[in-house]
Amino acid sequence: MKEDNKNKINRRDFFKLAGAGTLASAAALYGCSGNKNNGESESAALGEIPTDKMTYRTNPNTGERVSLLGYGCMRWPTRKRADGNGDEIDQEAVNDLIDYAIAHGVNYFDTSPAYVQGLSERATGIALKRHPREKFFLATKLSNFSPSTHSREESLAMYHRSFRDLQVDYIDYLLLHGIGMGGMEALRSRYLDNGMLDFLLKEREAGRIRNLGFSYHGDIEVFDYLLSRHDELKWDFVQIQLNYVDWRHAKEVNTRNTDAEYLYAELVKRNIPAVIMEPLLGGRLSRLNDHLMARLKQRRPQESVASWAFRFAGTFPDVLTVLSGMTYMEHLQDNLRTFSPLVPCTEEEFTLLEDTAQRMLQYPTVPCNDCKYCMPCPYGLDIPAILLHYNRCINEGNVPQNSQDENYREARRAFLIGYDRSVPRLRQANRCTGCGQCNPHCPQGIDIPAKLQEIDRFVEALKQETL
């Protein structure tokens, strides 16, 4: 197996590279096209996938060698239930994906009680139970977002349920989930005032938690506060959102976010390993427009567009693992090629990706990452599908500003036909009542009812031809 891939670029050189001056400015370009479901890969490259070339990073606290590609268990494949009443996880497909991943060197699996509408931990546990415990590292979270789960009793119940669903007697990596959502008030309610942080620290001492950390979204005050207590709490790792757009343009994507450049640097100062989420910015970095895609393809014609984003995230030397929610075998295979072994980005490639980020930001997409925390909607809306269709049409140039646009007829037809194909009519934006149940669950802080009502008004204007 390939040794840790840090020797090609040291930390000092890397920061010199990543922090070098103002990069090339960019002009506005249009479009990018959608892909299969979550867009985790543009296409699978040709050729055999090696089983012994995975790049590993060493956890400095434990000496464990962790695969640089980590499996995010947020997007397991689903199928219709036999009784027709909703969806269920396709366990056979999950088993196949996990078997293939382990056979090709992946050993880090990240789940949560909140994933796949509460079904992920159980499905992940069933699949991993078929493998020797020493073959994998399991990460899960205390996902007590809802005020009804903030009490010590409910939080403890969630924690112990994770052990049962995952069928393990210890957790390798346990995270305080989504700190920053709700600010300091939520942190105090979820983890401090109820004694849960103290409890988790004792669980780490007892060995039932091997590594304790947190994942961060939102309020930077909370991130800074928890890091300020590192000498006392000794965080073993921290999970952050990092990709070539969020590196320096996080606030341009979402005003409540903080640049990954800052987050990563703060972790490096304290020698805290970084686990990376959203390396594809919710799939958007695998759905570039034709022009941007062609620029990347010209450099590496045999590699997918998604591979550039994964290489960017994996190049940082203090990254322990890069998570990818791989729903389909083709996504898994493409990512395995990228990390077996990882080829770090060059200075020229960093410049190209910064330019790509600037060009992408010309288009006002909704910062939805398809996490599905907003689901299920009590009124049956498919919220992520609505927002993703809207984003896709923006990137493809199919959101006309008025009926005088040159391509108005084609864009109108593409938007409306695509809308009905992507979202069943009974689950479209016009069904939104504005109840707001979804809003507190969104880690990106989107005002979901307001955005759905905006999209519905746009759809009606297209139908009535009143733009």
Predicted features along the sequence, with ranges:
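Active-site groove signature of glycoside hydrolases
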Residues: 166-186
